[in-house]
Design a protein with these regions (language model features):
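Short, intrinsically disordered, charge-balanced linker/junction segments flanking boundaries
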Residues: 23, 175-176
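Short beta-strands and strand-loop turn motifs
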Residues: 47-49, 146, 176
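Extracytoplasmic thiol/disulfide redox context detector
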Residues: 2-86, 159-163, 167
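Cysteine-centric redox/oxidoreductase cores and disulfide-bonded domains
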Residues: 84-173
Length: 176
């Protein structure tokens, strides 16, 4: 596990720099995480970081009402896009995405609910251990979680996608 933490930290630093530029040109599309009717008359795109306390507050205080009154009634198509301010938020996103679109929102709900626990767990290993617990609740195994966290191509694609979204929509903070 110590090797995994060293690898993840090294890959994170590299990806946020020069490899992100490469991802712009040769990346496969990143799956949009969508709730609600894809043909709804209104589209809301939320930009959030898994480590952002204000994003966690939005997901506990505002999002449930938005979901019940607008998303589940077919009035709104809700798109969730991650923002990567730090490696911990990136790792959380990678684990949530590893579970696929059907389980993604359940996992991020848990990640926001338990954000104070996992994001303050201490060192890298402790944080990955806490994030892995959430992934396991969604049915992911250790091998799946480790494979997702070590997938450098996916990381490169996500970083390129994130940077393109930030530039296109001029996102400077979260939640947006």
């Amino acid at each position: 596990m110590k090797f995994l933490m060293t690898l993840l930290s090294t890959v994170w630093i590299a990806m946020m720099g020069t490899l992100a530029a490469q991802a712009e040109t040769d990346k496969p599309p990143v799956t949009e995480m969508i709730l609600g009717d894809v043909n709804a008359p209104i589209e809301i795109i939320e930009y959030a970081s898994m480590t952002c306390p204000h994003c966690a507050n939005f997901h506990s205080d505002v999002y449930p009402q938005l979901k019940a009154n607008y998303i589940e009634t077919g009035k709104v198509k809700f798109v969730f896009r991650e923002v990567y301010f730090d490696k911990y938020g990136m790792w959380a996103s990678m684990i949530a995405r590893c579970a696929g679109p059907d389980r993604f929102f359940g996992i991020i709900d848990q990640m926001f609910e338990k954000q104070k626990t996992w994001s303050r767990a201490g060192n890298d290993l402790a944080i990955v251990t806490e994030l892995s617990k959430i992934g396991k609740l969604a049915g992911l195994g250790d091998d799946q979680i480790n494979a997702c966290l070590q997938d450098a191509d996916n990381l490169r694609n996500l970083v390129g996608w994130y940077k393109a979204n930030m530039e296109e929509h001029k996102i400077s903070g979260t939640p947006s």
